[in-house]
Amino acid sequence: NPMQPLHREEDVLELVIRDLTYAVENLPEVATAKGRVNAWGAKGMLAKVYLARSGWKGGTRDNADLEKAKELAADVINNSGISLYENYEDLFKYKHNNNPESLIAMQWVPLGDWGVCNTLLADLAGNSKMTGGVNVWSSYQASIDMLQQYELGDTIRRNATFCTPGTYYSYICIADGGYTYDGAT
C-alpha cells in the first residue's frame, strides 16, 4: 500500500538497539567459524547505532547516546582482542583475510554465482577482471572532495582505499601477476 506511513526513524533504531543488545548478550565472545559475528562484533555495531542515534544530522547531540557509544566502543577497543594492523594496505590483501583488525569479516566466495560472492565488491569494482567475472554497476568513483582529504603524496592510504588510474596492485588478480587499474569500467 503506497499510502502506508513509513516507520519512524527512532522506532527503527530502538528495534535495532534491542536486537544488537540481545546479540551482545547471547553470541559467543569468539566466533564459531570464519565470517560469523561474535558478541564483540555485535557490540561494535551497537556503538555505531548509538552514535547514529545521537543526532548527527539534527544539529544537536544526545549526550546520553554519545556516552553509550563511547562506552561500548572503548570496551571493544580495550577488551575484544582486536588490534590495528601496522600497514593499512595489508588489510585489503587476500592473505590477510580475517586478521586481528577484523571485527566483522564477510567471506568471499570466488567465482560463485551472483548472490554468493562478495556482492559489495562486485557492486563497486572498477571492472569484472577484479572480481573474477562478476560485477554490476562499477561506475562508482571517489569524488574530488574525498580524494582531496588525503595528504599530498599519501599514495599508500589513498590507493589502498580507492583504485586510482595508473596504479599497479600486486595483490589483485594475483594469478595474472597483479592488476593495473586503467580507470575503465
PLM feature spans:
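Aromatic/His-enriched, Gly/Pro-containing loop or helix-boundary segments
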Residues: 2-14, 26
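Flexible helix-coil transition and linker loops at the boundaries of alpha-helical arrays
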Residues: 26-36
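Aromatic-rich, solvent-exposed beta-strand/loop patch
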Residues: 28, 184-185
